[in-house]
């Protein structure tokens, strides 16, 4: 009578952890393989992340410094974000602060230009 896959699985399921570990080591030695996860898949993910960074379509508008003209910057922040006076003032004084998240490149560039004209230092991330 031939041994079936079910027989092998039943036998393996009855092994202790130590016996199973030894069996895996014997498989590795006999067939020249490794039970370690393949790292190639991880490299492909990292490569995909690099491509995504090059083709970034959403940006975060970060106010780095308000500069000397804090009142002008607060006015622009209020106009861009719709925040109230106190919230805009807190955002300007609590730099670095994220003013907008997930905005398009065009919107981010326009907002950056407005803030820089008001005297602020801005980064797009």
Curated annotation (Swiss-Prot):
Gene3D superfamilies linked to this entry: 3.30.1390.10, Single helix bin (1.20.5.710)
One of the Pfam families matching this protein, by short name: Ribosomal_L12_N
Ribosomal protein recorded as keyword: yes
Keyword Nuclease (UniProt): no
GO molecular function, one term: structural constituent of ribosome
Keywords per UniProt: Ribonucleoprotein, Ribosomal protein
Record-level GO cellular component terms: cytosolic large ribosomal subunit
One Gene Ontology term from the biological process aspect of the record: translation
InterPro entries, alphabetized: Ribosomal_bL12, Ribosomal_bL12_C, Ribosomal_bL12_C/ClpS-like, Ribosomal_bL12_oligo, Ribosomal_bL12_oligo_N_sf
Superkingdom of origin: Bacteria
Family that this chain belongs to: Belongs to the bacterial ribosomal protein bL12 family.
HAMAP family: Ribosomal_bL12
Functional description taken from the UniProt entry: Forms part of the ribosomal stalk which helps the ribosome interact with GTP-bound translation factors. Is thus essential for accurate translation.
Subunit details: Homodimer. Part of the ribosomal stalk of the 50S ribosomal subunit. Forms a multimeric L10(L12)X complex, where L10 forms an elongated spine to which 2 to 4 L12 dimers bind in a sequential fashion. Binds GTP-bound translation factors.
Name this polypeptide is given: Large ribosomal subunit protein bL12
Gene: rplL
């Amino acid at each position: 009578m031939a041994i079936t896959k079910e027989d092998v699985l039943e036998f393996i399921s009855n092994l202790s952890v130590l016996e199973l570990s030894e069996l895996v080591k014997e498989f590795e030695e006999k067939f020249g393989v490794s039970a370690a996860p393949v790292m190639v898949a991880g490299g492909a993910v990292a490569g995909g992340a690099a491509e995504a960074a090059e083709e970034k379509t959403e940006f975060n508008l970060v106010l780095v410094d308000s500069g000397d003209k804090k009142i002008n910057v607060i006015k622009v922040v209020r106009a861009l974000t719709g925040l109230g006076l106190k919230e805009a003032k807190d955002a300007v004084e609590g730099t670095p602060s994220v003013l907008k998240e997930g905005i398009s490149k065009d919107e981010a560039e326009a907002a950056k230009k407005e803030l820089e004209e008001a005297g602020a230092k801005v980064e797009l991330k």
